[in-house]
Amino acid sequence: MSQLVDRRLSGKNRSAVNRQRFLRRFKAQIRKAAAQAVSGRKVADLERGEKISIPSKDLSEPIFHHGPGGRRNVILPGNREFVSGDRIDRPAGEGGGGSGGSPDGEGMDDFVFELSKEEFMDYFFEDLALPDMVKKQLAAVPEVKKSRAGFVSHGNPANLHVVRSMKQAIGRRLAMAAGPREALRQAEEALEALVAEGRGAEPDAEALREEIAALKARVAAVPFIDTWDLRYAHRVDQPVPSSQAVMFCLLDVSGSMDEDRKNIAKRFFMLLYLFLTKSYERIDVVFIRHHTVAKEVDEEEFFSSRESGGTVVSSALELMRDIILARYPTSNWNIYAAQASDGDNWDDDSPRCRDLLLQSILPLTQYFAYVEIEAEEPQSLWREYERVKAASPRFAMQRILALEDIYPVFRELFRKKAA
């Protein structure tokens, strides 16, 4: 019976299995820490690790032990200090008196460990997905395309590769005839030597002639091409991603959006952008900033540049509509949008925003999410968008009143739907 001994060095990941088991066990605590990360630090720093603190009581294993009551008259082995009848004080806990100890000084210190960037992001984006990430016409039959995958010895005659087959035949003939050809050469040289010596009529010469004839017959019997030589071009079905998506991010940077509100809006979109790049490889993200005039910008300018002015939200919606019609046909793209604003808008423009959504944008999109930031009272845009929400299931809206609301609102807007 054979035995395999794995002598490979585990390196720095020698405890990877135990670590994964530990992460699964304390999943609830880790998810709670991930939810607090948005309010505890900048969203731009989400792509790094995180320190997780777990209470010591959650680490303890259930055990059987003697209760605090009852009487025990026993002297344990190794005792040198006590005799029967002595009363022993309960030992103090291990909690330290420093800043990291337990509050009462009698418990155990919390256990703190570091999550890697990948582990933290996995927990952070758990249970999140773009809603309805599928096209109805593509759901039933996945799209595939043929791609080359070398050559095979069996296949459709229409896929016969002549050049590859002839190469195989030449190689086979050379291999099969190599031995007889060498023997034929040696026999012919021996016969020539006998003839040169005048012994061409001797029995040895006749035997060589018979051997030469047999060897020539063997060489001639090697087929020019055989079924073993045939090679066919092989093609396999490669799945083609049937769902490609584009996400529009619309940000209000008008004068009514103060720096605190802009900061919350930027954090929301940065969180959204991290989610998209984490979860989907084939997705476009279009950044649109607007005040009185809308402008498509790159990621850096979207988050960093500062402008001010009035508020005309319809300019951003019109630009989004034009970009969809120009670059993202609905037959090939799933279209999603998220808009962040304080809700302050020119009163005459809010009804136009409602009409643009209902008539031009929502018919082209799968989902449109709107977040209103730090608006104490519903603004005109919010009231018009409530009418949009009542008219279309593709539209969702939430309010963010504080920095701590970003993550819960984000999860509510983009949570997975139960199957």
UniProtKB/Swiss-Prot annotation:
Signal peptide residues are none
Which ranges are annotated Gly residues under compositional bias? 93-104
The annotated region (Disordered) lies at 85-108
Query: Which InterPro entries is this protein grouped with?
Result: UPF0229, vWFA_dom_sf
Highest taxon of source: Bacteria
PANTHER family found in the cross-reference section: UPF0229 PROTEIN YEAH
Q: Which HAMAP family match?
A: UPF0229
Similarity-based family: Belongs to the UPF0229 family.
Q: What is this protein called?
A: UPF0229 protein Tbd_1233
Question: What organism is recorded for this protein?
Answer: Thiobacillus denitrificans (strain ATCC 25259 / T1)
| Species classification | Bacteria, Pseudomonadati, Pseudomonadota, Betaproteobacteria, Nitrosomonadales
